[in-house]
Amino acid sequence: DTVFQGAHQFPDAVGRISRLCLALEVIPVFVPPLEHGMQNTIESFNGLWQAKVWQRHRVENVHELQACSDRYIAAHRARTRMATEAAPARRSIPENFNLNLHAPLRGQMIFIRRTDETGQVHLLGQRFAVSPDWLHRLARCEVDFDHHCIRCFALRRRAPAEQPLLTTIAYHRTDKPFYGEL
């Protein structure tokens, strides 16, 4: 979605929501679309909601759909309460916060990507070489705007705690003006 990642046809584009996250020192994480697994919780939830609400219930109007959805979401929250309570506390946006969409980017963005047949990943509208030995596998790519680099780590479903560094890529993003509104 361009609101988050920026216009896909332009290299190095960063959208307004990602800029908001970076300004608030929150690290945006992007997972590959339609990729199954723990790293894609929202895609999994959307699939569950469609199966349990949208496809299961026949409703006459949007109010009935909202009621079915509310019941499902309440049940889902009850089932996942322990995990939610164990998550880090959420912070409020500071009252004096003023978003400057034109400020230079600071902090990090993380992209979970699957390498292609040559060991490259596609992110920020570009291809980056990760490893010729890591083909068709998941990699965590940390774009560090402060240190001007992209660090790529191997991800394995069988050993999620082991994430060896595959490569560090020099990355100098020129500060481009932001086009658009909040």
Where would I find each of the regions flagged by the language model?
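C-terminal, beta-rich DNA-binding module of retroviral/retroelements integrases
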Residues: 73-182
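A non-catalytic, amphipathic alpha-helix used as a structural packing/dimerization or gating element
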Residues: 67-71
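RNase H-like DDE/DDD metal-dependent nuclease/strand-transfer catalytic core used by mobile genetic elements
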Residues: 1-64, 75, 161-162, 167-181
